[in-house]
From Swiss-Prot:
InterPro entries: FAD-bd, FAD/NAD-bd_sf, FAD_monoxygenase, Salicylate_mOase
Pathway participation: Aromatic compound metabolism; naphthalene degradation
Gene Ontology BP term (one): secondary metabolite biosynthetic process
The protein's name: Salicylate hydroxylase
Gene: nahG
């Protein structure tokens, strides 16, 4: 056979980290014959820390675009009729008085993390995932990467995608390659008590306390000074996910003890004491006998997500606070963006630097804005915004439309811009799509 017609070897893509976005990316990429995908997970099996997770309309579009819509909708919850358009109702923490609602147009979409992960795992072909593989070192040798793992094994690839979480080992490699200092996660000063409540139990508690059962069915957010509480249903309404946030603003740069775990068991009394004076919302917390306490950390905005042939996605790149329900969604947007480009048969080892440059240029500014506004949103919830303060009417008005820019972001336009940079799409095609 003529060498010019010889089939090119498949591009070797290694994904380090098997959470929702890493697994979603692997599932999308492994469908393409020009890609050889391997997923490396440090744990002995796939698993997600946490319970319920909420997705905005933008994240749901990414899920569908990745070809995972059917798996998602089989396990996801939606706000029931006639409140199907509501994302959250906003209420005063002291007495649950109604302050307003945010209308997403598609309502709240939420899922138990473990359920969604299990649904994805069922579709992963054999031979893609390897477990107990914790990456410790990366060496670039020409156009090839050598990944070393703690167990002494190695893997050689053309592209490495780091989705290894907020404590990412690969982030140091990327930042050092850019001549930047290593960035550690930072404690936000906010902790969250988390628990899951049987919806029937919660209904009974609300009946006893004379609280409208509507608050069980529709996602709620109770707002107060230095704290807020959110609820939304999961597992087809059988369970209500509860997260109660409390913030200490006594230190301008709060720290968490280096030897203290980020997640620990807590007592109900400790949680109730943190929300003394919160009225009806305490009836909700009284249904959680053994909460867990989470010390919430995030990352500073990174100066870059890419070095050489290594790219960071998800929490490894932009770990953020949960106040906009956007962290997991941003990881899925990263996955969608890369899947649309890497899945093109014109992707090859020679144009990977250009492709990754487009990813960094087009995804990073948006993800950084989400990180930044998430912190601001938390201050708004807890009546600490420097302009709005405790003006509850104004808080409700702002929250009604605050997330529109996030939910309506046109990720396909970003992909089209990247394809234009790659020479894969003409200006006329983009104009036609936007017109």
């Amino acid at each position: 056979m003529n060498d010019m017609n010889a089939k090119k070897p498949a591009l070797r893509v290694a994904i380090v980290g098997g959470g929702i976005s890493g697994l979603a990316l692997a599932l999308s990429l492994c469908k393409h014959s020009h890609l050889n995908v391997q997923l490396f997970e440090a744990a002995p099996a796939f698993g997600e820390v946490g319970a319920g997770v909420s997705f905005g309309p933008n994240a749901v579009r990414a899920i569908v675009g990745l070809g995972l819509g059917q798996a998602y909708f089989q396990v996801a919850d939606r706000t029931p009729q006639p409140w199907e358009d509501i994302w959250f109702e906003w209420r005063r923490g002291s007495d649950a008085s109604y302050l307003g609602a945010t209308i997403a147009g598609v309502g709240q979409s939420s899922v138990h993390r473990a359920d969604f992960l299990d649904a994805l795992v069922k579709h992963l072909p054999e031979g893609i995932a390897q477990f107990r593989k914790r990456a410790t070192q990366i060496e670039q040798q020409g156009d090839e990467l050598q990944v070393l793992f703690r167990d002494g094994t190695e893997y050689r690839c053309d592209l490495l995608i780091g989705r290894d979480g907020i404590k990412s080992a690969l982030r140091s490699y990327v930042l050092e390659g850019q001549g930047q200092d290593h960035l550690e996660p930072r404690f936000s000063g906010t902790c969250a008590y988390r628990g899951m409540v049987d919806s029937l139990q919660l209904r009974e508690a609300y009946r006893i306390n004379g609280i409208d059962e509507h608050l069980v069915d529709v996602p709620q957010m109770y707002l107060g000074l230095y704290g807020h509480i959110l609820t939304f249903p999961v597992r087809k309404g059988r369970i209500v996910n509860v997260v109660a946030f409390t913030s200490d603003r006594s230190q301008p740069e709060p720290t968490w003890p280096a030897d203290a775990p980020w997640v620990r068991e807590a007592s109900q009394r400790e949680m109730l004491d943190a929300f003394a004076g919160w009225g009806d919302a305490r009836a909700l917390l009284e249904c959680i006998p053994a909460p867990t306490l989470w010390a919430l950390h995030d990352l500073p905005e990174l100066p870059g997500y890419v070095h050489g042939r290594v790219a960071l996605i998800g929490d490894a790149a932009h770990a953020m606070l949960p106040h906009q329900g956007a962290g997991a969604g941003q990881g899925l947007e990263d996955a969608y963006f890369l899947a649309r480009l890497l899945g093109d048969s014109r992707t090859e080892t020679g144009n990977l630097p250009e492709l990754l440059g487009a990813y960094d240029d087009l995804r990073r500014p948006h993800a950084c804005r989400v990180q930044r506004t998430t912190v601001e949103t938390g201050e708004l919830y807890e009546l600490r915004d420097p302009i709005v303060g405790a003006d509850e009417q104004l808080v409700g008005e702002i929250l009604a439309t605050r997330f529109d820019w996030l939910w309506n972001h046109d990720l396909d336009a970003d992909v089209a811009e990247a394809r234009l940079r790659m020479g894969w799409e003409a200006h006329e095609q983009i104009a036609l799509r936007q017109g």
